[in-house]
Regions:
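Internal helix-turn-beta structural module
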Residues: 305-350
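Acidic (Asp/Glu)-rich catalytic clusters
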Residues: 47-50, 80-84, 128-137, 223, ...
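Conserved phosphate/anionic-ligand binding catalytic regions in large, soluble enzymes, centered on
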Residues: 55-68, 327
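N- or domain-start disorder-to-order transition segments that initiate the globular core
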Residues: 7-47
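A contiguous, surface-oriented mixed alpha/beta subdomain in the mid-to-C-terminal portion of proteins
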Residues: 234-236, 241, 249-264
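Conserved, mostly hydrophobic/aromatic
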Residues: 59, 265, 331
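Active-site-facing alpha/beta catalytic cores
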Residues: 2-6, 73, 86-247, 269-270, ...
Length: 353
């Protein structure tokens, strides 16, 4: 009698929608393609030091309500024109959430917030939102966590991120080497910048790895390498790394590795000591460095939503509209002065030559 040696801990399989079917249902339009391409090209120029503006990735910690996300997008779009000479604003649109242990893994994994894990619907909802944003002329940025999800939506993403928990992962470095947009790698949760530097070096090179095609067929993927990757300083469990000394040390390390000196600073997470109320202060300190002439800082990240703070998921209590269910965010009204301060810093740096 044979022993069970395969799938011993698998409790079921469900069909996954092939990427090509979703792209047929919700196709990239000409207008959307212009939004995405413009965002990518401008971000690349900023990362390469050919554009002196700041790249600002701003938006909710995670997306759980597309109606609120679109309302936030409309607010953001209303300030873009007045700031576009100094800032390239990309909306943070995160559909996948890495968890330290367990918890809600994001809109793609559980779009109904009820443990039904309707992933096909989650992918469809995510792509529809990205299309809506692109049609508004607003480029989007997201974290790539699952290495298959780019096939469903990467054509609508202007800037991508690899999180602190996955920067050291070989498959994420390989994936980044084939992504069509600039990609930021965060320093590790322990504060190590070297793993992000190593990741950028790896992602610049061609790779060959296992993945799936748009038709959902298993394939060996060969990539060309991604020349537009950069470090994201996000602080760590032991404290911030957005101050001038840490920025200088990171820029020197990336330069020594032959990767340029440009980096982006996350004003949340370890840099805010996990207190959203500190984000404006962190952004102000970063702005001061920019105004003083620092040219290694090419951008910032902000976690911002319609309503300040965060809330817990509970079936017994209705969710507050426009408030995060993951990390706490600053409110929209708190966000606008931060954006204005960053824009003023760029003008000051520009004026100083």
């Amino acid at each position: 009698m044979f022993e069970v040696t395969d799938d011993a801990r698998i409790v079921g399989y469900r069909p996954l929608l092939p990427p090509a079917i979703l792209l047929e249902e919700l196709p990239l339009t000409e207008h959307a393609s212009h939004t995405v391409t413009r965002g990518r090209r401008q971000a690349e120029k900023i990362i390469q030091g050919e554009d002196d503006r700041l790249l600002v990735v701003v938006g909710p910690c995670s997306i759980h309500d597309t109606k609120a996300a679109l309302e936030y997008a409309d607010h953001l779009q209303s300030v873009v024109e007045g700031l576009q000479n100094d800032l390239l604003i990309i909306m943070r649109v995160y559909f996948e959430k890495p968890r330290t242990t367990i918890g809600w893994k994001g809109l793609i994994n559980d779009p109904h917030l009820d443990g039904s894990f309707d992933i096909n619907n989650g992918l469809r909802t995510a792509r529809r939102l990205l299309l809506d944003l692109a049609h508004r002329g607003l480029p989007a940025g997201t974290e790539f966590l699952d290495v298959i999800t780019p096939q469903f939506m990467a054509d609508l993403v202007a800037w991508g991120a690899i999180g602190a928990r996955t920067t050291e992962s070989q498959i994420h470095r390989e994936m980044a080497s084939g992504l069509s947009m600039p990609v930021g790698f965060k320093n590790g949760t322990d504060g190590s910048v070297q793993i992000a530097i190593d990741a950028i070096g790896a992602a610049r090179h061609p790779h060959h790895f296992l993945s799936v095609t748009k038709q959902g067929i298993s394939a060996i993927v060969s990539t060309a390498g991604n020349p537009n990757c950069h470090v994201i300083l996000r602080g760590s469990n032991s404290g911030p790394n957005h101050h001038a000394e840490a920025v200088k040390a990171c820029a020197e390390a990336t330069s020594k590795a032959g990767l340029g000196t440009r980096l982006l600073i996350d004003c949340s997470h370890g840099n805010s000591r996990k207190d959203h109320r500190n984000q404006p202060t962190v952004a102000g300190e970063v702005a001061a460095q920019v105004a003083a002439g620092d040219r290694s800082i090419c951008g910032v990240m902000l976690e911002s939503h319609l309503v300040e703070g965060k809330q817990n998921q509970s079936s017994a209590t209705p969710l507050v509209y426009g408030q995060s269910i993951t990390d706490a965010c600053i409110s929209w009204t708190q966000t606008v002065p931060v954006l204005q301060e960053l824009a003023a810093a760029v003008r000051a740096r520009r004026a100083a030559g």
